[in-house]
UniProtKB/Swiss-Prot annotation:
<dbReference type="GO" id="GO:0009245">
    <property type="term" value="P:lipid A biosynthetic process"/>
</dbReference>
<dbReference type="InterPro" id="IPR009081">
    <property type="entry name" value="PP-bd_ACP"/>
</dbReference>
<feature type="modified residue" description="O-(pantetheine 4'-phosphoryl)serine">
    <location>
        <position position="36"/>
    </location>
</feature>
<dbReference type="GO" id="GO:0000036">
    <property type="term" value="F:acyl carrier activity"/>
</dbReference>
<keyword id="KW-0963">Cytoplasm</keyword>
<dbReference type="GO" id="GO:0000035">
    <property type="term" value="F:acyl binding"/>
</dbReference>
<keyword id="KW-0596">Phosphopantetheine</keyword>
<keyword id="KW-0444">Lipid biosynthesis</keyword>
<keyword id="KW-0275">Fatty acid biosynthesis</keyword>
<keyword id="KW-0443">Lipid metabolism</keyword>
<dbReference type="GO" id="GO:0005829">
    <property type="term" value="C:cytosol"/>
</dbReference>
<dbReference type="InterPro" id="IPR036736">
    <property type="entry name" value="ACP-like_sf"/>
</dbReference>
<feature type="domain" description="Carrier">
    <location>
        <begin position="1"/>
        <end position="76"/>
    </location>
</feature>
<dbReference type="InterPro" id="IPR006162">
    <property type="entry name" value="Ppantetheine_attach_site"/>
</dbReference>
<dbReference type="GO" id="GO:0016020">
    <property type="term" value="C:membrane"/>
</dbReference>
<comment type="similarity">
    <text>Belongs to the acyl carrier protein (ACP) family.</text>
</comment>
<comment type="pathway">
    <text>Lipid metabolism; fatty acid biosynthesis.</text>
</comment>
Length: 77
């Protein structure tokens, strides 16, 4: 499973949004209705799924689904 698909599954599960709404350009707040607590929980779940720690200063830069995928991909290089 690609990282995008893993991230998408986590978002759908955590936020309860329709999978069709989860695109790389989708904003967590504006398009998916996430608040700051939802985003913090998503970051923690991404950390667990990908076995990493995302520093707060990096987590603050993750505003879209694509941002999250790019960050995860950057860890694997």
């Amino acid at each position: 499973m690609e990282n995008f698909d893993k991230v998408k599954d986590i978002i759908v599960d955590r936020l309860g949004v329709d999978a069709d709404k989860v695109t790389e350009d989708a904003s967590f707040k504006d398009d998916l209705g996430a608040d700051s607590l939802d985003i913090a929980e998503l970051v923690m779940e991404l950390e667990d799924e990908f076995g990493t720690e995302i520093p707060d200063e990096e987590a603050e830069k993750i505003n879209t689904v694509g941002d999250a995928v790019k960050y995860i991909n950057s860890l694997e290089k």
